[in-house]
Amino acid sequence: DGAVHHHIAALAPDLLTITFNGLSKAYRVAGFRQGWMVLNGPKHHAKGYIEGLDMLSSMRLCANTPMQHAIQTALGGYQSINEFILPGGRLLEQRNKAWELINQIPGVSCVKPMGAMYMFPKIDTEMYGIHDDMKFVYDLLVREKVLFVQGTGFNWIRPDHFRIVTLPPVHQIEEAMDRLKRFLQNYHQ
C-alpha cells in the first residue's frame, strides 16, 4: 500500500527505546512463539530495568534452542516478504479479496488492514439482533463450518466485532465469505 515503517529508535536516538519483534508475524511462521527485544539509546538511566530483564530472561529452563537458531537464520537469510506483499503477492491478494468480500455483506464493514494478517470487521448488531458475539461465532461454526474469533476475545467490550485471519488461499477466503453471507441472510439471535 506504499506505507513506510519508521523505526522509533531512529527518530529519537537520545532516548532509550525498546523494540520487540518475533518470528510469528515478521517471518510468517505462525505458532513459533519466539521473539526478541532490542534496547537502543542511552541505557545508563535504565540499569535496574535492564538487570531485571536479564534476570527474567535467565530464569527460563530449557530454552527453545532450535527456535533461537531460527531467529538467526531468519534475520540473516533472504528476506522474501516483498514477494508476498507487493502487487501480485499472495498475502496482498488474500488480504484484498477478504476485505473486498467482507465489505459487500450487508451490515458488515471493515477498515483495510495495513501490515496485519487479520481483519477486525464490525457487524451491525441491531440488524442481526446480536447481543452475544461468542454465540454468533459459535452458531456460524456449527451451521457453516467457518471459524472466526469473537471480538470480545480481544478485549473489545461490545459484541459488534469479530476477527478473520487472511492467511488462507483466495479460494478458501471466497468460500468462507460466501458461507458468512449465506449464514447472515437469515440469522437473528
What are these regions (language model features)?
Residues 72, 88-102, 110-124, 158:
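Conserved glycine-rich beta-strand-loop-beta hairpin in the small C-terminal domain of fold type I
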Residues 1-8:
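Conserved PLP phosphate-binding loop immediately N-terminal to the Schiff-base lysine helix
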Residues 19, 106-110, 147-153:
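A short linear hydrophobic-aromatic micro-motif
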Residues 40-41, 76, 122-124, 167-169:
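Residue-level recognition of strand-loop junctions within catalytic nucleotide-signaling folds
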